[in-house]
Amino acid sequence: MTWKTQLPPVRGKLLVDEALAPFTWFRVGGPADVVFLPADEQDLADFLKALDPAVPVLAIGVGSNLLVRDGGVEGVVIRLGKGFNTVEALGDNRIKAGSAVPDAILARKAAEAGIAGLEFYAGIPGTVGGATIMNAGCYGSETANILISARVMDRRGQVRELTAAELHFTYRHSALQDAGLIVLDAVFEGLADDPAAIKARMAEITSRRETTQPIREKTGGSTFKNPPGHSSWKLVDEAGWRGKRFSASGKEGGGAMFSPLHSNFLINTGEATAADLEGLGDTVRADVLAKTGVQLDWEIKRIGRPA
């Protein structure tokens, strides 16, 4: 008898040996030992309190910036969805959003409430939880500019509130990445503005994204962080990797490729494995370093075991 046969009772769903590929935008990767879809915050807390503390736990959102390796993920993967997707305007140009709220939805709700400053979220294909953890940003703005506080839950099911200062935001990073905490919701603050003007700016961002990024492909968004003084897409492009296919097995062609539309977007053309995608990323990193002396660091989160 293993821990998987002795899981705590829940009101949500427990899926044993569940494939993770459908939970990510890349559509690759092996299974999780267990996927837990909590009904709400209390369901999540009760589960964590009762779960064997030796079992690893990882929370995910919509999997838009996530690469799951082909061997799958040990322990419990918590997928936050219903029960964590409410948005509430608080007054004083503040708005609260659950961790499972898509960033673009938060931007739209803020616009409707006349709160400016969150427009850039219209260009980020993730959720509030992920944006908080990685300090997501684009077009000159980032989460650190607008976040006031976040409520988080630890491995024991205990909840506490952290201020923006306590999150220690830096470029595409926060203290949450190393703390094993699950974001429940966050409060943001913007500036008062006319809803129509805000929506017009959001429309510009959405249009720009649609014409410059492969948003209809199986992708994980920006693959590499921008090194100081450089643009990752330009380094990848100048190294000759735009549109070039790759297979980890060494076969000609392959299903992994850096997008012809935007060379910092790694895409699965339909037949790639996680090993192909990660292998291409690491090959490009090594090639760029050899040619330019510039180190590219992954922005996409890679989890799990190789096959």
Curated annotation (Swiss-Prot):
It holds the Pfam family FAD_binding_4. One of its GO terms (cellular component) is cytosol. Cell wall formation. It comes from Caulobacter sp. (strain K31). Its main location: cytoplasm. Belongs to the MurB family. GO terms for biological process: cell division; cell wall organization; peptidoglycan biosynthetic process; regulation of cell shape. Disulfide bonds: none annotated. This is UDP-N-acetylenolpyruvoylglucosamine reductase.
